[in-house]
C-alpha cells in the first residue's frame, strides 16, 4: 500500500474577506497551463515561505495580490487540498470583514471582485469553496440571502 496521497508539496494560506451582506472577495485566476484552479474564481492566497507561520503567510499573500491589509484574521480551517492530477498541499483558511475603507486592487490574476452568495452559481468556483463560504457566513453570523 502506498501513501502517494500524503505527498504534500507545501503550505498555502488564503483569506475569505467578506462584507456584512455576505459577499466574498474572489480572484479570477489567470488562464495559464500548469496553474492550479486556472480560470476559476478563488479567494486570494498563496504559498508560505520557509518557516513562515500560516497567518503571516495569508496576510502577506493577500496584501501582495490585493493591496488590502487584513488586520484581524480569524482561523476557519486547515486541510489537505487534493485535486486529481495535482500534488496536494496543506491549505489554511482565515476570514475577516472588509472594512469598507481600504482600496482593493487586482495585482494578480485577471480580475477581483466581491461576489454575492446567491450569484455564486454564475461563476466557476470550486464546490468545496462554496461550502467553506457558507461555514464562514455562519461563523460571522451572517444570514445567506
Annotated model-derived regions:
Residues 7-8, 16, 32-34, 83, ...:
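Short secondary-structure boundary/capping segments
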